[in-house]
């Protein structure tokens, strides 16, 4: 049996299928995705609540990361990719005709599997996005660096060496730096694509504790191949299989009393 973090199971239960608009960060409606003639996602519909951690789980190739990348339109970069359906972010379709994709990606931060700091100092990594936005005031930048590094639980470890190369940090520290860089531009939503898969157990635990803290300010969506991790950090979990959303429920419900046999088979290790 997979144990669920008590802090998540004690949260108010939400009716995920009838979530009020004011509690909904993302409303995914009848989403289909194709790579050329091959369909990768099939009629995905789900509502992701504000200021909660939502996990996408499922076997390799099930569509977890593909769905995640729809949320900030990273799939636009794939020439043969075509999307039908829509995703509303706080009531506005992010696939609408007049959407500024660059602006959308400022509102939706993303952290990938492997830490990808820029070849710059720790300080310059954090302020990179702010500089792109035209922020030049050193006081504003300094405050953003401290606030973001504190938010990523890294400030105390690097405050005396902000001008050191980001590459001088450990893997776990680099991943927290990337998170700090993402939150420096104050996104509304933070996407994490298997953020601990390349890290050691101690660094993984630090990131997991950070994820739990981040939901105080952000809506967090995490893709993970690790079911135990999903149970530890998430409030809701969506199980995908072969591009289809099989089940979406509060994490403790999905892991203890799943309603679909496919879900039960997966979490008990019968396949996947």
Swiss-Prot record:
Which residues participate in ATP binding? 58-65
- GO MF assignments: ATP binding; ATP hydrolysis activity; ATPase-coupled phosphate ion transmembrane transporter activity
Cited Pfam families? ABC_tran (PF00005)
Identify the enzyme class: translocase
Q: How does it sit in the membrane?
A: Peripheral membrane protein
Top-level taxon of origin: Bacteria
Major place of residence:
membrane
Q: Describe its function.
A: Part of the ABC transporter complex PstSACB involved in phosphate import. Responsible for energy coupling to the transport system.
Q: Protein name, please? A: Phosphate import ATP-binding protein PstB
Source species: Idiomarina loihiensis (strain ATCC BAA-735 / DSM 15497 / L2-TR)
């Amino acid at each position: 049996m997979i144990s669920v973090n008590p802090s998540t199971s004690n949260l108010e239960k939400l009716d995920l299928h009838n979530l009020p608009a004011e509690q909904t960060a993302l409303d995914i409606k009848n989403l289909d995705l194709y790579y050329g003639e091959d369909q990768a996602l099939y009629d995905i519909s789900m509502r992701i609540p504000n200021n909660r951690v939502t996990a996408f789980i499922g076997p390799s190739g099930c569509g977890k990361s593909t769905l995640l990348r729809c949320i900030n339109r990273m799939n636009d970069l794939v020439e043969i990719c075509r999307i039908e359906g829509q995703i509303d972010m706080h009531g506005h379709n992010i696939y609408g005709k007049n959407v500024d994709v660059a602006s959308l990606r400022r509102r939706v931060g993303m952290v990938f599997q492997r830490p990808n700091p820029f070849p710059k100092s720790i300080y310059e990594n954090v302020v990179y996005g702010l500089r792109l936005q035209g922020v030049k005031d050193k006081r504003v930048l300094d405050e953003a660096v401290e606030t973001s590094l504190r938010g990523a639980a890294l400030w105390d470890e690097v405050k005396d060496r902000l001008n050191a190369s980001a590459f001088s940090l450990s893997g776990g520290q680099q991943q927290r730096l990337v998170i700090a860089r993402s939150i420096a531009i104050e996104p509304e939503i933070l996407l994490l694509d298997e953020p601990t898969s390349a890290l050691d157990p101690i660094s993984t635990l630090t990131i997991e504790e950070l994820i739990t803290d981040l939901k105080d300010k952000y809506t967090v969506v995490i893709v993970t191949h690790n079911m135990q991790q999903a149970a530890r950090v998430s409030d809701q979990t969506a199980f995908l299989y072969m591009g289809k959303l099989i089940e979406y429920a509060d994490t403790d419900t999905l892991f203890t009393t799943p309603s679909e046999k496919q879900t039960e088979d997966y979490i008990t290790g019968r396949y996947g």
